[in-house]
């Protein structure tokens, strides 16, 4: 029942999961994703203005010259208009590029992480290691995460998204994800957290996240990696620090 209510909250109150025919962003839970959404919205506004301007020009020119089919035959060259349609798009691209570069730099920057989680992609599941924590037997806390088969799904669980084991993390904590793969190229992607990083064999890629609210966040492998590519979901549970420590003691 609690699982059902939690998923209902995520789907209705917080849009943290994919929905049928959803062509929009999921609600952000990290500063990185908030920056991505803000950049997208700002760019879309100016693109709509440009679209309206270009459409108006095309309509005006078409209407004007359709009334006088002779005029365009004597217009062979227009240096002014050529300069305008060369410089104006270049300026627009520069305006878009600068905030994009700033956001890209901030997303790649790993700021004094309080903990590190290693995510290893394999065909076709994920393996996680909490490198900073050791259990009672002196081993690193680690586990594997598999998709729950359709015939074993419980009420409120999501097809091809829920897993048998979740990655539990504390909120308001700088977390570094170190991502790699053991066989082929995978991709570690969680839309609500603004995370998307390649998992490449023999290479360690890293990305940071500061989750600002509790909740359950879903992701998937976003790189075609074989026949069961769709069966590599990612499930992140963000909880309070006391709840995280309690979970950690149980491992």
Curated annotation (Swiss-Prot):
<dbReference type="InterPro" id="IPR034210">
    <property type="entry name" value="CcO_II_C"/>
</dbReference>
<protein>
    <recommendedName>
        <fullName>Cytochrome c oxidase subunit 2</fullName>
        <ecNumber>7.1.1.9</ecNumber>
    </recommendedName>
</protein>
<keyword id="KW-1133">Transmembrane helix</keyword>
<feature type="binding site">
    <location>
        <position position="229"/>
    </location>
    <ligand>
        <name>Cu cation A2</name>
    </ligand>
</feature>
<feature type="binding site">
    <location>
        <position position="221"/>
    </location>
    <ligand>
        <name>Cu cation A2</name>
    </ligand>
</feature>
<feature type="topological domain" description="Mitochondrial matrix">
    <location>
        <begin position="65"/>
        <end position="82"/>
    </location>
</feature>
<feature type="binding site">
    <location>
        <position position="223"/>
    </location>
    <ligand>
        <name>Cu cation A2</name>
    </ligand>
</feature>
<feature type="transmembrane region" description="Helical">
    <location>
        <begin position="43"/>
        <end position="64"/>
    </location>
</feature>
<feature type="topological domain" description="Mitochondrial intermembrane">
    <location>
        <begin position="16"/>
        <end position="42"/>
    </location>
</feature>
<dbReference type="GO" id="GO:0005507">
    <property type="term" value="F:copper ion binding"/>
</dbReference>
<keyword id="KW-0812">Transmembrane</keyword>
<keyword id="KW-0496">Mitochondrion</keyword>
<dbReference type="Pfam" id="PF00116">
    <property type="entry name" value="COX2"/>
</dbReference>
<comment type="subunit">
    <text>Component of the cytochrome c oxidase (complex IV, CIV), a multisubunit enzyme composed of a catalytic core of 3 subunits and several supernumerary subunits. The complex exists as a monomer or a dimer and forms supercomplexes (SCs) in the inner mitochondrial membrane with ubiquinol-cytochrome c oxidoreductase (cytochrome b-c1 complex, complex III, CIII).</text>
</comment>
<dbReference type="GO" id="GO:0042773">
    <property type="term" value="P:ATP synthesis coupled electron transport"/>
</dbReference>
<feature type="binding site">
    <location>
        <position position="225"/>
    </location>
    <ligand>
        <name>Cu cation A2</name>
    </ligand>
</feature>
<keyword id="KW-1278">Translocase</keyword>
<dbReference type="InterPro" id="IPR002429">
    <property type="entry name" value="CcO_II-like_C"/>
</dbReference>
<feature type="signal peptide">
    <location>
        <begin position="1"/>
        <end position="15"/>
    </location>
</feature>
<dbReference type="InterPro" id="IPR045187">
    <property type="entry name" value="CcO_II"/>
</dbReference>
<dbReference type="InterPro" id="IPR001505">
    <property type="entry name" value="Copper_CuA"/>
</dbReference>
<keyword id="KW-0460">Magnesium</keyword>
<dbReference type="GO" id="GO:0004129">
    <property type="term" value="F:cytochrome-c oxidase activity"/>
</dbReference>
<dbReference type="InterPro" id="IPR014222">
    <property type="entry name" value="Cyt_c_oxidase_su2"/>
</dbReference>
<feature type="binding site">
    <location>
        <position position="225"/>
    </location>
    <ligand>
        <name>Cu cation A1</name>
    </ligand>
</feature>
<comment type="function">
    <text>Component of the cytochrome c oxidase, the last enzyme in the mitochondrial electron transport chain which drives oxidative phosphorylation. The respiratory chain contains 3 multisubunit complexes succinate dehydrogenase (complex II, CII), ubiquinol-cytochrome c oxidoreductase (cytochrome b-c1 complex, complex III, CIII) and cytochrome c oxidase (complex IV, CIV), that cooperate to transfer electrons derived from NADH and succinate to molecular oxygen, creating an electrochemical gradient over the inner membrane that drives transmembrane transport and the ATP synthase.</text>
</comment>
<dbReference type="Pfam" id="PF02790">
    <property type="entry name" value="COX2_TM"/>
</dbReference>
<keyword id="KW-0472">Membrane</keyword>
<feature type="topological domain" description="Mitochondrial intermembrane">
    <location>
        <begin position="108"/>
        <end position="251"/>
    </location>
</feature>
<feature type="binding site">
    <location>
        <position position="232"/>
    </location>
    <ligand>
        <name>Cu cation A1</name>
    </ligand>
</feature>
<keyword id="KW-0732">Signal</keyword>
<feature type="binding site">
    <location>
        <position position="221"/>
    </location>
    <ligand>
        <name>Cu cation A1</name>
    </ligand>
</feature>
<feature type="binding site">
    <location>
        <position position="223"/>
    </location>
    <ligand>
        <name>Mg(2+)</name>
    </ligand>
</feature>
<dbReference type="InterPro" id="IPR011759">
    <property type="entry name" value="Cyt_c_oxidase_su2_TM_dom"/>
</dbReference>
<keyword id="KW-0999">Mitochondrion inner membrane</keyword>
<dbReference type="GO" id="GO:0005743">
    <property type="term" value="C:mitochondrial inner membrane"/>
</dbReference>
<feature type="binding site">
    <location>
        <position position="186"/>
    </location>
    <ligand>
        <name>Cu cation A1</name>
    </ligand>
</feature>
<keyword id="KW-0679">Respiratory chain</keyword>
<dbReference type="InterPro" id="IPR036257">
    <property type="entry name" value="Cyt_c_oxidase_su2_TM_sf"/>
</dbReference>
<keyword id="KW-0249">Electron transport</keyword>
<keyword id="KW-0813">Transport</keyword>
<keyword id="KW-0479">Metal-binding</keyword>
